Amino acid sequence: MSDQGRADALSASHEGSVTQRKLVPDHDLVGQIGERHFGEIFGLPLGPIHLSGKNDDHKDFEIAGHKVDIKTSRKPYNLLVEEGKCEGRTIYVHVGLNGSVPTLLGWQWGKRLLQSTPKPFNTPYTCHYMPVRQLRPIRELMEQHKKSLADRK
């Protein structure tokens, strides 16, 4: 299924949800592009679309037994995770989107993001955050992923 097809199905599943916040019209498409790009780079399949509209447990992928939540943005100055939804043992990956071209910018543990004082960042809610220049390098996460795959053999 295409990114647009997955985004349309995801949008339809959220219809009427009080927890779904769309900050831009193509919110779901932006997220799908980032998730697909991460999956391609890391050799991981995209997970099923949660057509029930229920929370997906903030898990887009799993690496070495840890949840991975992909955060994609067209203005990727800071990795943002909504206050109350940031989990210490989750890996958050920041993907920047320039037009339709995604770039993996970095990652960080939720426990480090939780150390930030939440701010609104032009959103209707406050977010834990980390500037992109302070994120851990993607190559480090890739090395952990390769090691966990090798350990399974």
Name every feature range the model reports, one short phrase each.
Residues M1-A64, I70-K153:
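Nucleic-acid endonuclease domains
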